[in-house]
Design a protein with these regions (language model features):
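ATP-dependent carboxylate activation and anion-phosphoryl transfer catalytic cores
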Residues: 1-107
């Protein structure tokens, strides 16, 4: 929905505890974003993954981007919707450490 509830994991003497509600924000959360992406950009007969990836060193993201692009090339429908493939939603450069991408395949 349009309300985001932030939580927090806290270290205590006994281990970890979850604080279930630190704050509530009016914002587009990932459920809304994924629904908008699906309805606007994906072909109806596909399934996909919205991935947020972290890379530990410079160059890792760029290498992964090259491998995924080669292994899963983008295919579009006649009306321009994503039918299958890997599609980066963020720029990937030599110093990139975080990346968001879609990976889509036919059901």
């Amino acid at each position: 929905g349009y309300l985001g509830v932030d939580m927090m994991v806290c270290r205590t003497e006994d281990g970890f505890r979850v604080h279930p509600c630190v704050e509530i924000n009016l914002r587009m959360n990932m459920g809304v974003v994924s629904r908008l992406i699906t309805d606007t950009y994906l072909a109806p007969s596909v399934q996909g993954w919205y991935v947020v990836e972290h890379y530990g060193a410079d160059g890792e993201a760029l290498e992964a981007h090259k491998q995924l692009s080669a292994a899963h090339p983008v295919r579009l429908t006649a009306d321009g919707r994503l039918q299958s493939g890997y599609f980066s939603l963020t720029p990937v450069k030599p110093g990139t450490r975080y990346q968001v991408y879609l990976q889509v395949e036919e059901k």
